[in-house]
Amino acid sequence: RRQRQMCIRDRNWNFIHKGEKMMNFDELADLLFPSIDKTPEYYEEKYPPRQLKEGARVTRFAPSPTGYLHFGNLYTCFASYLTAKNTGGVFFVRVEDTDQKRKVDGAVDAMLKGLEVYTVKADEGVIGEGNEIGDYGPYYQSARKEIYQTYAKSLVKQGLAYPCFCTAEEIDEIRQQQGNDDIKGYWGKYAKCRDLSFEQIKQNIENGMPWTLRLKSPGDIEKKCYFDDMIKGKIEMPENVIDVVLLKTDGIPTYHFAHAIDDHLMRTTHVTRGDEWIASVPLHLQLFKVLGFKPVKYAHVAPIMKEENGGKRKLSKRKDPEAAVSYYSEVGYPAASVNEYMMTILNSNFEDWRRANQSASIYDFPFNLKKMSASGALFDFVKLTDISKNVISKMSAEEVFELSNAWSKEYDEKLAVLYAKDEQYAKDILNIDRENKKPRKDLAKWSDIPDYISYMYDETFTPCYELCGNATNELAKSVLEKYIDEVNLNDDKDAWFSRIKSICEPCGCTPNVKEYKQNPDNFKGHVGDVSTIIRVALTGRTNTPDLFSITALLGEKRVKERLTKALEYYKENK
């Protein structure tokens, strides 16, 4: 067991348990941080506790500007956003940009745009590249260097942190020496710089030796750390004994140190993050303790899973296009569809709630972190598609047009051109069967529209005369010869259908489907087969929305032209 040192402070001088004078920590702090003249008390006063109602939660989205927004980011962010929103709290955005080498230009704006698309709006924090609002900033970590160093200096003054002059090569040697040790890292007998004297430290600094600042961990190798995760429940882990780096050689903090200080000063109450960070919780709780902070509550989210070859794997940024949030915009899934789907995998009881509250906003749902999956939600494209079809079916034609038109201008120039020719015509097409008691659910995404409406435009219509059911080419020839003479676009729907039924008997069919089923050998088909022949002639398809509405929109000239061409085909291909 590592021997625990008991520090006794007498004014500015510090002693270990044997009474040996070791270090003036105040002098050491001034040596390491000569330009830092503020104290933690200054920042505690500058960023006071938030005046919120009891139970209100303060959450955050804290991305690194190193790439695109992926689905896992959005999923975790949505959980944080709902947690704050449902409790009357605060949701803010903080950019963790301390690693400037990995920073990608435009990444912040791209991520914020992604959040905006999916209706996640921050109450404070970063709202654009270099632009922020709120009283608890700066919200860019790169602008908070003085804050971190103030708390670092305070730890040095308390004998809780020390400078380390070990090189990368020396750290590698330590790793090799540790071999198969259970605990690997800079700790115990391997922490070579832990007990350097003031004179040694001063000499090293005067010699220009670079240094990092390390935590003097108070952890005990035989003790456990206990915490209650909001998603995974009670967790037990060994205490942290590693003297981790707090500040790198350039004075920039590590994630661990910055996280503790930022979430304390920004008065965060709940941190929702990926479960890859569970291993760091003992360290983070230890940092909160040595800094004198009240710890946040953690909710560790399992990764989104995907079925593959009978098993499951993590949704991959490299393998799966749907891992990128931009994918859903590119193919045209409405944001409302993605949000609705996301709610079903965030909380399993959402679907029951939705059935009972069909017109309610998703933000009325009583989201609960504790009801998130502890083992990882399964991404289901089929379910997303079904949900999206349902969402789009409830939209008005005007809304479908506006959203798909905006999408087409960015992703489908040909569709944008079709729309621009006659916007009202496009809206009328999209309105077919939309106002029924049970609207059709043909569209799952905006990229489905070009094919869905293609037969309504001559330049995109591709004739196809393949029939189904009882319809034969010979019957089609007979039906079209008679129907061409019957076409009258002044008819209402009942009159139009009566004309179709009137040509059934002359063609050897029955206008009564029930009669056909009772005596199929007596007829060549029924009124449904006759309608299918007309449908195929006009649209090239056996299944479409309401044929009467399609006929009315196409107009008499185009209807007769298409019927004539189809008739010619069936005459040549009996």
For every predicted segment, state its role.
Residues 291-470, 539-574:
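Catalytic adenosine-cofactor/nucleotide-binding cores of aminoacyl-tRNA synthetases and other
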Residues 1-8:
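Short, small-residue-biased leader/transition segments that mark boundaries at the very start
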Residues 59-66, 92-97, 265-271, 322-324, ...:
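Glycine- and acidic
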Residues 80, 111, 155, 159, ...:
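Residue-level signal for inorganic ion chemistry
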Residues 499-554, 558:
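Helix-rich, typically C-terminal accessory recognition domains appended to large enzymatic cores
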